[in-house]
Amino acid sequence: MTKRYWNIILEEMMEAGVHFGHGTRKWNPKMSPYISAKRKGIHITNLIRTARFLSEACDLVFDAASEGKQFLIVGTKKKAADSVARAAIRARCHYVNKKWLGGMLTNWYTTETRLQKFRDLRMQQKTGRLNSFPKRDAAILKRHLAHLETYLGGIKYMTGLPDIVIIVDQQEEYTALRECITLEIPTICLIDTNCDPDLADISIPANDDAIASIRLILNKLVFAICEGRSSYIRNS
């Protein structure tokens, strides 16, 4: 993996509050190497380590994107949802930002069946065919379509398992992370001071509660993905 420069600036991370961890009582001792201080009952993340692992993650996603690999970004809590959708759309990645449906990856056949149903209903809506059904049936199908749009809208173009999964909050998305581990799908995970750094392939120590922090980390990763995609197109 070639090392590149990703313009990761410590002052910028400090302004975004990337260094603020959880309260000192809510911490995982495994995070000790990534913590630089305690301040007013809060752990402070070592931003030098954050910059290092974020840079490694950017190198990884650049290389993967330059080979045409597919990405899935997962972040379902309210503070992360909008940033996840925007970042994924910008980099043409798949995303889940509402609710992780158990077995979404490990039971891919069921997910694929749901996606096919979703595509069929969308096509029927586009062509106006839904309106040809009896009123009650049409209403049921439209509700079902809205439900599928909410939970599967971000993966509607996904035709197989992703090559790399980016996870915004390890604890919130633990089910998704476990599925990736089971399937041996490489993961990049934002980890706060209450997380286990050993679970993901690349763990980025960062504040996973502040919108500005989440957005900054995602923007760096997405920029690297976009650069990799451009390289892939040039070399195709």
UniProtKB/Swiss-Prot annotation:
GO terms for molecular function: structural constituent of ribosome. Keywords: Chloroplast, Plastid, Ribonucleoprotein, Ribosomal protein. Signal peptide: none annotated. The keyword Plastid applies. Pfam families: Ribosomal_S2 (PF00318). GO terms for cellular component: chloroplast; mitochondrial small ribosomal subunit. SUPFAM superfamilies: Ribosomal protein S2 (SSF52313). InterPro entries: Ribosomal_uS2, Ribosomal_uS2_bac/mit/plastid, Ribosomal_uS2_CS, Ribosomal_uS2_flav_dom_sf. CDD domains: RPS2. It is found in: Plastid, Chloroplast. One of its GO terms (biological process) is translation. Belongs to the universal ribosomal protein uS2 family. PANTHER family: 30S RIBOSOMAL PROTEIN S2 PROKARYOTIC AND ORGANELLAR (PTHR12534), SMALL RIBOSOMAL SUBUNIT PROTEIN US2M (PTHR12534:SF0). This is Small ribosomal subunit protein uS2c. The lineage of its organism: Eukaryota, Viridiplantae, Streptophyta, Embryophyta, Tracheophyta. The gene is rps2.
